[in-house]
């Protein structure tokens, strides 16, 4: 059985995925982050704008990541009916993460879905990558529905590629078709949310893109001077 090592249950950033042969495989987010730079110009423009305003863009980015990680953790604990441990986070981070949790609760009460699992960690033996699916659920007909949580201000192409890779990973390892895939965008400023259905056409394109990234990754080392 493939193994998954997690240094902290509150974060996906330190999750190590291993295939059956014991070798480590990269995560979906590592592959996308290392091989794709479609939003590089947007990021550079934002960094320049923050610097001009006297802000440290690295600190802002890291803080946003911390809040997003905490929000994911809170939602997971809520779904599993577990206590939340908040000792290592600031009051501001906790407040913003609770906004995201409140947004999730508002969405969940009318979602008409049956919860099955949270933070499902899987490793693809066929394609040699690992990933953590935020939420697995079923609709009232018993069909499988995958949901990915985002606390970012926008939904980008990278996110589509990510959920496409998760869907293929789930279908390979669980041998069950995924009926629908959604991205649930949770606000950190209020209890508002946006529910994005990802079409089959977009998922197909996302999976094709991810396959190209898988092929590109081994070439990266060969091209270094």
Regions picked out by a protein language model, each given a short descriptive name:
Residues 1-130, 225:
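Metal-dependent nuclease catalytic cores that hydrolyze phosphodiester bonds in DNA/RNA
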């Amino acid at each position: 059985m493939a193994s998954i090592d997690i240094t902290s249950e509150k974060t996906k950033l330190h999750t190590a995925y291993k295939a059956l042969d014991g070798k480590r495989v990269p995560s979906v987010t590592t592959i996308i982050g290392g091989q794709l730079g479609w939003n590089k110009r947007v990021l550079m423009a934002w960094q320049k704008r923050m610097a001009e305003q006297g802000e440290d863009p690295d600190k802002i980015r890291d803080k946003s990541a911390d809040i997003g990680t905490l929000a994911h953790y809170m939602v997971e604990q809520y779904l599993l009916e577990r206590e939340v441990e908040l000792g290592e986070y600031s009051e501001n981070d906790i407040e913003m993460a609770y906004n995201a949790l409140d947004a999730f609760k508002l969405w969940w009460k009318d979602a008409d879905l049956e919860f099955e699992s949270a933070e499902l960690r899987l490793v693809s033996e066929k394609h040699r990558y690992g990933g953590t699916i935020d939420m697995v659920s079923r609709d009232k007909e018993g069909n499988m529905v995958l949901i990915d949580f985002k606390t970012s201000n926008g939904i980008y192409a990278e996110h589509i590629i990510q959920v496409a890779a998760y869907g293929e990973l789930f279908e390979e390892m669980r041998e069950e078709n995924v009926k629908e895939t959604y991205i649930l965008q949770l606000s950190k400023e209020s209890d508002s949310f946006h529910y994005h259905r990802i079409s089959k056409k977009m998922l197909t394109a996302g999976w094709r893109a991810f396959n190209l990234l898988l092929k590109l990754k081994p070439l990266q080392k060969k091209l270094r001077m």
